[in-house]
Amino acid sequence: MDDTQHFCLRWNNYQSSITSAFENLRDDEAFVDVTLACEGRSIKAHRVVLSACSPYFRELLKSTPCKHPVILLQDVNFMDLHALVEFIYHGEVNVHQKSLQSFLKTAEVLRVSGLTQQQAEDTHSHLAQIQNLANSGGRTPLNTHTQSLPHPHHGSLHDDGGSSTLFSRQGAGSPPPTAVPSLPSHINNQLLKRMAMMHRSSAAAAAEETSHAFKRLRGSDNSLPLSGAVGSGSNNNSPDLPPLHARSASPQQTPADFSTIKHHNNNNTPPLKEEKRNGPTGNGNSGNGNGNGNGASNGNGISISDKLGSLTPSPLARAGADDVKSEPMDMVCSNNNANANDEHSNDSTGEHDANRSSSGDGGKGSLSSGNDEEIGDGLASHHAAPQFIMSPAENKMFHAAAFNFPNIDPSALLGLNTQLQQSGDLAVSPQGKLTTNATTTTTTINNSITNNNNNNNNNNYDYSLPTKNSNSQKTPSPTTTTLTTPTTTTPTRPTAITSASGICGLNLSTFAANGSSSGGSNGGLSMTALLPQQQQQQQQQHQMSQQQQQQQQQQQQQGNSSSGQQQQPNGILACSTPKANTPTTTQQQMYAAVMAAAASASASTSGSANSSLNNSNSTLNTSGGLNNSASGGDDFRCNPCNKNLSSLTRLKRHIQNVHMRPTKEPVCNICKRVYSSLNSLRNHKSIYHRNLKQPKQEPGVGATQAAANSFYHQQHQQQQLNHHSSS
């Protein structure tokens, strides 16, 4: 006996726990693997649940290989879809009377179990058996019927026990009526509920006595569909049921809407304030007072209208307000009445009741999902289109406000030129670069100043450039032009010449004062300074004094052969050429002419004048200030090639390497290396052959080179001598 003994372990609240678990998973969006979308909104669900409750979804999801498909349903109202999903997960749903017809049509299309004609036909035999038991039992206690009921297992997740026991509660104390024929499968469950609401007053006491028996019936036979609610609801103690059956005996192909006469009114009528204030006590026309669909009765059989009194009028009294639609939460919330905990079966747990509660204490409602806020806010009427998230006025990315720049003041911009003119100064960098702070202004030149000084013993020289053609002498005429003027009132051109003279070690002031505008063939150097008219006289006097000082300084430099360096009056360290290694006067004139051009360029760049160097064979225009004023006044232009250089040192180096390049390549006479320029050769010797004595050149070779190109040969010798003296 011990070997054959087995124990049966039963989970009493298994069905309610399973359904509650699925509800909680969907509310938390856990393990959801399918999305239903319509009208631009979506609902997430589980494939297993949809497939178990709808053959349509079962076939569709079988043929879909996607892990998380999105099913777009055309011509389906979102509220109907939301109600269907809630029905699938909960087994019941509260639907407004005006939405009932479209809801049933959507359920028919999606073939939801419990809401279709096929489901009613499958359960017709069970309903007939229940009716026979009810007719033969008379006033027999209902728990006997519960024990004899079959238990089909066709997998329907909805719980229609409340619907099945709806009419038995109300007619328990009534006299037994005549025999009722078998109900056709197309009986509308909503019609039966509505008619039962009309007789709820007489059935309240009897339903209270048998409430526990009905709960047991509901727990043992959860799989009965909604359309089969007539079975347990056909308690023949109700005197008005035969007319109902005769009234609905004619077959109907589509679910009918059994609302009152005013159900054809506008469906978009907003809900009344009184109906909002009443809360989720019932949706009026359908008579579903709580989430279990038990008509106007809660779990213990007490009518909601009896409990609430005048707060919730009966459906007959509210016939004039049938066109008014309740809030969406009135249709979906179930447990906001006073005895919400009593509406579940005895097998239900407290956790299950808390999860199904939709009160304001934070518990999850039976229809709680990610779209509840959209349903409550965007659906004032059932068929209204979803509202815009933002109004057109709020949908602008930027406001029509002007952008202000407080740091830019037009008056300050207008006065910038004058301020810079007053605050500029002339500075000489340690590398010999002349830097100025100048602005561009337009000045009308009316006069040209020609400085003539014939007291220089070096007034004649021979200088030509291979890149310039022979032109006649030119004297600049008074024109209106744009030049760069210094911001200081002191003349700067003699200072620039003095600076250049200190850098080169030569007296360049002789070329600035040599010649006249009609110089002729004597090779005089004509310089015309274009200055403002108010400074011309002061410039002329200062230039004369500077020229005399430079002549005396040159004589002192030539007489002092022992000193390698001396300090100039302008504060620039100048390198003087040793007397012993000084070449002929012709070579010095050639080199001085080049440096005079560089000095004139620096002087004109600093904004003091527009200088022109003219002789019989070439014209050297060094008016760098005119053409370079737009670049900031820091460029030094080489006129033969029109190249701008940033400093005077670079301009000098450029003239030496490019325009004074000898015909023979610069070759180191010690290591015989060939370089691209004299500057590179000089750097090479200063690094590698600094301590070596320079070898003497052959006289014949030097004479040949001098005869071929005396200027370049002498310049090359000058570079070598300068390097030797510095080393």
Curated annotation (Swiss-Prot):
Residues 135-185, 218-378, 445-496, 532-583, 604-626, 694-727 are annotated as: Disordered. Keywords: Developmental protein, DNA-binding, Metal-binding, Nucleus, Repeat, Zinc, Zinc-finger. GO terms for cellular component: nucleus. Residues 281-298 have a biased composition (Gly residues). Residues 341-355 have a biased composition (Basic and acidic residues). Pfam families: BTB (PF00651), zf-C2H2_6 (PF13912). The keyword DNA-binding applies. One of its GO terms (molecular function) is zinc ion binding. It comes from the Eukaryota. Residues 135-149 have a biased composition (Polar residues). SMART domains: BTB, ZnF_C2H2. A zinc finger (C2H2-type) spans 636-659, 666-689. Broad-complex proteins are required for puffing and transcription of salivary gland late genes during metamorphosis. This is Broad-complex core protein isoforms 1/2/3/4/5. The gene is br.
